[in-house]
C-alpha cells in the first residue's frame, strides 16, 4: 500500500510492512476504500478470471460483510462468547454463521480454540453452503479444500458465497477493524 501520511512511506515505493500499522486510523480518516483493500487482499496471486470476477462483484453493488442483521448478530454473539479466538477462526466463524441451517450443524462442534470439522455432518446441504463450509475449513486449519483459483468461477462458488469468502479473507488478514469500512461506506451514501 502507498500511504503518504505514514512514517514508513518512501516516495514511490510500496510499504515494506506486511500489515499496515495505521490501518485503523486510515479507515477512520476515510482514506482507505473497501474495494481497494479487497483487491489488495489477493495480492499478486490473482489471475485474469479472478481479477475480472472481483472487479465485476465490487462494481455491481456496495460491498457488505454481513448478509443481514441475523448474520451479524450470530457472528457477534458467538465471537464474544469465545474470547481469545484467533483471527483465522473468527473469519471461519464469520462464514459458518452466515446461514442459520449451516450454523445449526456447526454449533456444537466448536469452541474458542477452533472447530471439530470431522464431526460436522453436511449431508443434504445446498452446494453453495458446501463451498462456504470448505472455505471456512481452509481458512481455519489450512489445506486446499478451496483454492484461490476456485473463486474465479461462479459455477463453483456462487456470487453470494464469493462475497462472504472475500469478507472472511479480509477479516482474517486485517482483523475486525475492516468491519468499520462497511460503516464508512454506508455513511458516505
What are these regions (language model features)?
Residues 1-126, 137, 141-189:
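Extended, charge-biased low-complexity segments
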